[in-house]
């Protein structure tokens, strides 16, 4: 007996808010565009490899900003490169998200004090949704950051601004740390 033979009874109907259905579809198909600039890019590439299998989370790396909804800025952003970061960000369709990966893209890293050529954080030129600390952060930390972006998408509602969604996410206290710890413990076993 197939679905059509059984008919459409109340048991076959799923009732959910439109927000929940749209957010589920968006968070289950994140298409990040990697913007690797320094050593953090190596860790980002390792995360995209088969050992970590991002596709199990519905995350498929894209090379074009017009096909992406998430930009991962990984590494040192120089003043000259900042213009390109902004240009690529503007080419991405809405809704778009930014994940800053590593100390250099978060706050300038070791170049903070004496590096006149380094941007002191990518958030000075584009809005950043999730920061992943580390120098360079491990692939597990990047996966945790991607999970944080998915939680941010899950919390959004139609008509809600990004700042309201970030505030709502912070109030729930959702943290990706348990996932990171579980991955490390299973990798060592």
From Swiss-Prot:
Q: Does the keyword Iron-sulfur apply?
A: yes
What positions does the entry give for [4Fe-4S] cluster binding? 39-40, 104, 135
Q: Which GO terms describe its biological process?
A: aerobic respiration; electron transport coupled proton transport
Assigned keywords, A-Z:
4Fe-4S, Cell inner membrane, Cell membrane, Iron, Iron-sulfur, Membrane, Metal-binding, NAD, Quinone, Translocase, Transport
Enzyme Commission number, as recorded: 7.1.1.-
Q: List the membrane topology term(s).
A: Peripheral membrane protein
Query: Record's Gene Ontology CC terms?
Result: plasma membrane; respiratory chain complex I
Q: What is its main location?
A: membrane
Name the chemical reaction catalysed here.
a quinone + NADH + 5 H(+)(in) = a quinol + NAD(+) + 4 H(+)(out)
Q: Name one GO molecular function term.
A: NADH dehydrogenase (ubiquinone) activity
EC main group: translocase
Q: Tell where it localizes.
A: Cell inner membrane
Q: Which cofactors does the annotated protein need, by name?
A: [4Fe-4S] cluster
- Fill in the subunit field for this protein: NDH-1 is composed of 14 different subunits. Subunits NuoB, C, D, E, F, and G constitute the peripheral sector of the complex.
Q: Which NCBIfam families match?
A: nuoB_fam, PRK06411.1, PRK14813.1
Function of this protein? NDH-1 shuttles electrons from NADH, via FMN and iron-sulfur (Fe-S) centers, to quinones in the respiratory chain. The immediate electron acceptor for the enzyme in this species is believed to be a menaquinone. Couples the redox reaction to proton translocation (for every two electrons transferred, four hydrogen ions are translocated across the cytoplasmic membrane), and thus conserves the redox energy in a proton gradient.
Q: Which family does it belong to?
A: Belongs to the complex I 20 kDa subunit family.
Protein name, please?
Answer: NADH-quinone oxidoreductase subunit B
> Which species?
Chlorobium luteolum (strain DSM 273 / BCRC 81028 / 2530) (Pelodictyon luteolum)
Its gene name is nuoB
């Amino acid at each position: 007996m197939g679905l059509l033979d059984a008919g459409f009874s109340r048991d076959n109907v799923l009732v959910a808010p439109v927000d929940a259905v749209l957010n589920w579809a968006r968070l289950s198909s994140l298409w990040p565009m990697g913007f690797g600039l320094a050593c953090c890019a190596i860790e980002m590439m390792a995360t995209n490899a088969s050992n970590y299998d991002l596709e199990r989370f519905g995350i498929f790396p894209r090379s074009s900003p017009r096909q992406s909804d998430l930009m991962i800025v990984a590494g040192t952003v120089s003043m000259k490169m900042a213009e390109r970061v902004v240009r690529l960000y503007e080419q991405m369709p809405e809704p778009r998200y930014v994940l800053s990966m590593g100390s250099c893209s978060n706050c300038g890293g070791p170049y903070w004090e004496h590096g006149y050529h380094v941007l002191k954080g990518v958030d000075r030129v584009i809005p950043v949704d999730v920061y992943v600390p580390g120098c360079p952060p491990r692939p597990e930390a990047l996966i945790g950051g991607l999970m944080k972006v998915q939680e941010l998408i899950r919390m959004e509602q139609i008509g809600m601004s990004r700042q309201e969604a970030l505030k709502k996410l912070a109030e729930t206290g959702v943290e990706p740390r348990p996932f990171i710890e579980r991955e490390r413990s299973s990798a060592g076993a």
